Amino acid sequence: MSAVMTPAGFTDYKVADITLAAWGRRELIIAESEMPALMGLRRKYAGQQPLKGAKILGCIHMTIQTGVLIETLVALGAEVRWSSCNIFSTQDQAAAAIAAAGIPVFAWKGETEEEYEWCIEQTILKDGQPWDANMVLDDGGDLTEILHKKYPQMLERIHGITEETTTGVHRLLDMLKNGTLKVPAINVNDSVTKSKNDNKYGCRHSLNDAIKRGTDHLLSGKQALVIGYGDVGKGSSQSLRQEGMIVKVAEVDPICAMQACMDGFEVVSPYKNGINDGTEASIDAALLGKIDLIVTTTGNVNVCDANMLKALKKRAVVCNIGHFDNEIDTAFMRKNWAWEEVKPQVHKIHRTGKDGFDAYNDDYLILLAEGRLVNLGNATGHPSRIMDGSFANQVLAQIHLFEQKYADLPAAEKAKRLSVEVLPKKLDEEVALEMVKGFGGVVTQLTPKQAEYIGVSVEGPFKPDTYRY
């Protein structure tokens, strides 16, 4: 094994095992070859150093792909301090490789809730005092919330927040509506090169991988219920169909439900006539009694509630690929049923009571990743080529906000600029072009006459903001 040396005297990190750094570095090198957009931005902007002076607080899954993102930010001039946004999602070899490179990181797989919050605090603090950060890169909104609640004085120096996922965007929009958001944010999640790649195509790849790794089950011929048919639900449904499962979809949005029908999925409800009145009587027990696998994909709370869990088929697999663990009512399961760990991130939930269980009892559910992100808890998440688009968006969003220097503006101007916006389409197209080049593709250029005819520039952007890809 080739050695990776941590800079002498560098102790500003906490990872599971620093000796995993060489392994992590080897995987980082491979990931770089699979992330053409991110590496293209690194080459394109390295000479300009657009992030020189940027001090970025980062809270996103500490994976190999995130390691490439971190080192790209550093290559463009930034200083960063990093933690993971999920207690199970860290790849310990990735965290070790970043620490060995002299970059502050606080993350390991299997953190407790208390350790998770401690890790975020360690990114905020340097030598026991709030770091003079001026940018935030978040996934899910926990870092953003802690800064607003516990360190509001730091927000006076912060130019902006870039948010990775649906849940975090919802939290930002709520804060903006309630008047509690203090700095502008870019909604990276709804960039086309994020939402279509990460949310749809990424889940198509990684969901069935995680379920198979966690359970060793054959999926073909079995029945699955996917809760939600947004981009994550679409990719998840395709992922299970690829395995030969009989996939049904539950949706609250008629448009998404229509899309599911058009894509060949049966749209059903776990509730009789679609109405949840909070009672067991409202559950469609005949439907749930046939379901072998249930997957939540919504970013909403209790979409797989206690009454549904009671009615599910014996030995059904239950998992979530939304951001937080509250999509499934795991609190009810902890309070009322016995948990038996089969292996890390795989539990048998015995529905025979809270105290004790018979190991040979067959009235149980198999819960993956304790209801947290299954693809990162039970597998390694999306492949590098998928995360390439998401993280290239993050880099461009960080540059975009850092150049605007919100914290330096007069108060009156700040009030006008306070918003949650999607990354400009021209930047979205820049990411897409680099990704196409990475596949060896060639994009056709409009002639001036063609561009004039449809009312766009030869260089783009090519679609209005209202266009639905």
Curated annotation (Swiss-Prot):
Gene3D superfamilies: Adenosylhomocysteinase-like (3.40.50.1480), NAD(P)-binding Rossmann-like Domain (3.40.50.720). Substrate binds at residues 63, 139, 164, 194, 198. Its EC number is 3.13.2.1. One of its GO terms (biological process) is L-homocysteine biosynthetic process. Its main location: cytoplasm. One of its GO terms (cellular component) is cytosol. It catalyses: S-adenosyl-L-homocysteine + H2O = L-homocysteine + adenosine. One of its GO terms (molecular function) is adenosylhomocysteinase activity. SUPFAM superfamilies: Formate/glycerate dehydrogenase catalytic domain-like, NAD(P)-binding Rossmann-fold domains. Binds 1 NAD(+) per subunit. Belongs to the adenosylhomocysteinase family. May play a key role in the regulation of the intracellular concentration of adenosylhomocysteine. HAMAP family: AdoHcyase. This is Adenosylhomocysteinase.
